[in-house]
Amino acid sequence: MAAQMREPKVVVLGGGSWGTTVASICARRGPTLQWVRSRETADDINENHRNSRYLGNDVVLSDTLRATTDFCEAANTADVVVTGVPSHGFRGVLTELARELRPWVPVVSLVKGLEQGTNMRMSQIVEEVLPGHPAGILAGPNIAREVAEGYAAAAVLAMPDQHLATRLSGLFRTRRFRVYTTDDVVGAEMAGALKNVFAIAVGMGYSLGIALVIARALREMTKLGVAMGGSPDTFPGLAGLGDLIVTCTSQRSRNRHVGEQLGAGKPIDEIIASMNQVAEGVKAASVIMEFGLTMPIAREVDAVINHGSTVEQAYRGLIAEVPGHEVHGSGF
């Protein structure tokens, strides 16, 4: 009788809300280890099956999920790595990982952002720091707390190798969490980074209708994403429009919260200091403008966050745009 293949061990790097949620999902499918920096968080996960700091006391995690603060243990035992650390710490963690990780282990990013200074996507950083390791991204319209509470949701796993993507998608799939696949890594990553900036714009409000901002934001997202090599078919899907809608409308959206606080007149440094999680749109706003395309919504968000503009000035800047062709025009 042939020996049964063992389940691959998933190692999730990062102890935030989405990393923990994905780790708990994976633990229901097979052996999963979560690396966190905080001993308190590790103990909470191991002893109470909770991550109270990021998901509150009501969300109960899989009782088979185990957490560790030992990075070497995590890296040395991984068959699949899932990275949930913020974009500003992503490269540093991968550099540590490169010293310990076995060859060819796939690396799937949960991060929806771009690296400041290089403008690189997370999968590009994986390819640079961990050559030979298949890189992918799990993207889609997911608010961590809602998925952790069991609401039905979906995501797309983007990898160049669709055979591998199909195999790995089963590690994340449950009855209530649907996982599709695509080979458009560029489109999925660009959509994930861009939607955070547009959610800040929605949060700022100032008499701009949500439907108007979302519709025009989708045009800007598609424009830059396609220019970077993404497929136009990706942006009306889960990683694009789906994630854009949920991030712009959910009361649990961190990036929308930043926009609301900006609209209330608070300075960006004060807003960031008051949050215990990262809003990737704050960093992505300046990176997006470096690509040099005409993107009025992103331009005004960047002006408010990084150049001292007010929300009222941002509103006036958008309203001053002359409407042109809905699809081919470059204005708002």
UniProtKB/Swiss-Prot annotation:
PANTHER family: GLYCEROL-3-PHOSPHATE DEHYDROGENASE (PTHR11728), GLYCEROL-3-PHOSPHATE DEHYDROGENASE [NAD(+)] 2, CHLOROPLASTIC (PTHR11728:SF1)
Pathway: Membrane lipid metabolism; glycerophospholipid metabolism
GO CC annotations, alphabetized: cytosol
Keyword field: Cytoplasm, Lipid biosynthesis, Lipid metabolism, NAD, NADP, Nucleotide-binding, Oxidoreductase, Phospholipid biosynthesis, Phospholipid metabolism
UniProt name for this protein: Glycerol-3-phosphate dehydrogenase [NAD(P)+] 2
Location in or out of the cell: Cytoplasm
Catalytic class of the enzyme: oxidoreductase
Family as reported in the entry's similarity comment: Belongs to the NAD-dependent glycerol-3-phosphate dehydrogenase family.
Its EC number(s): 1.1.1.94
Keyword Cytoplasm: yes
Origin organism lineage: Bacteria, Bacillati, Actinomycetota, Actinomycetes, Mycobacteriales
Pfam families per record: NAD_Gly3P_dh_C, NAD_Gly3P_dh_N
List of residues binding sn-glycerol 3-phosphate: K112, G140, K195, D243, S253, R254, N255
Binding site for NADPH: S17, W18, R37, K112, A144, R254, V278, E280
Example GO biological process: glycerol-3-phosphate catabolic process
The keyword Lipid biosynthesis belongs to this UniProt entry's keyword annotation: yes
Residues forming the catalytic site: K195
Protein's job: Catalyzes the reduction of the glycolytic intermediate dihydroxyacetone phosphate (DHAP) to sn-glycerol 3-phosphate (G3P), the key precursor for phospholipid synthesis.
Molecular functions (GO terms): glycerol-3-phosphate dehydrogenase [NAD(P)+] activity; NAD binding
Alphabetized NCBIfam families for the sequence: PRK00094.1-2, PRK00094.1-4, PRK12439.1
Reaction(s) the record says it catalyses: sn-glycerol 3-phosphate + NAD(+) = dihydroxyacetone phosphate + NADH + H(+); sn-glycerol 3-phosphate + NADP(+) = dihydroxyacetone phosphate + NADPH + H(+)
Organism encoding this protein: Mycolicibacterium paratuberculosis (strain ATCC BAA-968 / K-10)
Gene: gpsA2
